[in-house]
């Protein structure tokens, strides 16, 4: 769980095993699509992202999350970044602040929030961790998808290059008054890849150069969701932290 390994760490607690966080994305990072959204040709990636955030009330789809690294000195440099870890699964969200990030392969793990608390369920460990959501969603990449529609309140959106068939938008966290570093995010760069008005990828880079890439597919927008979709009750005998 890498791209979101650190993403989840920001949401929950650094004391929780790293493996459990590979299912977050950025929070970050997780974005959805809809054929009902119409965007003008040539519209900037930043404006496409703003419109997507404004128009998406609920959504669900599939994700692939990869942790990448540069090749070492004794490895071939020809193939570029190497995949260190990869997870796959399903995600659901409902604004404001509700989501399920359901990792299904290579292990089963869920990150759930109803807007009030965050729950991390690890099936292999038979363990559920509960944390207060608080301002976490507003100050992390999760705000891109799961928060309210005020994306510009927390980030400056800067149009970047066209790459891999997408228009990339850099999200620069706005400085938070009375904090030493201006923000608590563990990333030096947060980018969203837009294509035809739809967010297709989320890329997170930390100070050590580690890259987490989340790609999204089979997205359905503004779907009807049952009220209990964002609740979770640990099974009998599970450890609760």
Predicted feature residues:
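Bacterial N-terminal signal peptides that target proteins for export
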Residues: 3-26
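N-terminal mature ectodomain segment of secretory-pathway/periplasmic proteins
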Residues: 54-115
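Sec/Tat signal peptide C-region and signal peptidase I cleavage site
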Residues: 36-40
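Bacterial N-terminal signal peptides
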Residues: 24-34
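Acidic/charged, solvent-exposed loop-and-adjacent secondary-structure segments enriched in E/D, K/R, S/T
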Residues: 120-146
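A mature extracytoplasmic/lumenal domain signature
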Residues: 65-67, 95-97, 103-107, 115-117, ...
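Gly/Pro-enriched, hydrophobic low-complexity segments
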Residues: 42-43, 129-131, 153-156, 160-241
């Amino acid at each position: 769980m890498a791209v979101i390994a650190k993403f989840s760490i920001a949401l929950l607690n650094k004391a929780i095993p790293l493996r459990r966080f590979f299912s977050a994305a950025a929070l970050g990072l997780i974005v959805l699509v809809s054929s009902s959204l119409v965007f003008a040709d040539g519209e900037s990636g930043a404006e496409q992202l703003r419109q997507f955030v404004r128009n998406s009330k609920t959504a669900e789809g599939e994700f692939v999350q990869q942790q990448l690294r540069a090749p070492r000195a004794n490895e071939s440099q020809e193939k570029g970044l190497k995949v260190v870890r990869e997870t796959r699964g399903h995600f659901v969200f409902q604004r404001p602040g509700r989501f399920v990030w359901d990792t299904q392969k290579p292990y089963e793990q869920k990150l759930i929030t109803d807007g009030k608390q965050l729950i991390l369920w690890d099936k292999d460990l038979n363990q559920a961790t509960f944390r207060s959501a608080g301002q976490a969603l507003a100050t992390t990449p999760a705000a891109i998808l799961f928060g309210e529609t005020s994306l510009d309140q927390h980030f400056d959106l800067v149009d970047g290059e066209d790459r891999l068939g997408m228009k990339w938008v850099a999200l620069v966290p706005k400085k938070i008054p009375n904090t030493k570093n201006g923000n608590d995010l563990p990333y030096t760069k947060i980018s969203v890849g837009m294509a035809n008005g739809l967010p297709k990828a989320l890329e997170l880079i930390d100070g050590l150069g580690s890259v987490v890439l989340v790609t999204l597919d089979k997205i359905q927008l503004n779907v009807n969701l049952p009220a209990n979709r964002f609740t979770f009750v640990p099974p009998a005998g599970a450890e609760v932290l």
